[in-house]
Amino acid sequence: SLGRTLEILAEVIKDRKQEKTEGSYTAYLFTKGKDKILKKVGEECAEVIIAAKNSSLEEIRYEAADLFYHLLVLFEEMGLNLTEIAEELNARRK
């Protein structure tokens, strides 16, 4: 499921942040800091929009995956976890 996949990816991201894995793009983002991470989130948002404008499902899938990944990096940088996001979404359904 998407939820489990995101949980696993979030754990990998957390590990890369803590271990500062050499050659890791994730570790690089954390080294560069919040501004770099925010820039990447913005870029990926724009790329999802462009993919949708192009009506390309393949492009949307690819860019959405990039956006999910960069959002997870941002969440880790900010100390936010997926459970908190899920709780917010669930609260909105009421």
Stretches found by the model and what they are:
Residues 1-64, 68-94:
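Flexible "arm" and connector segments at domain edges
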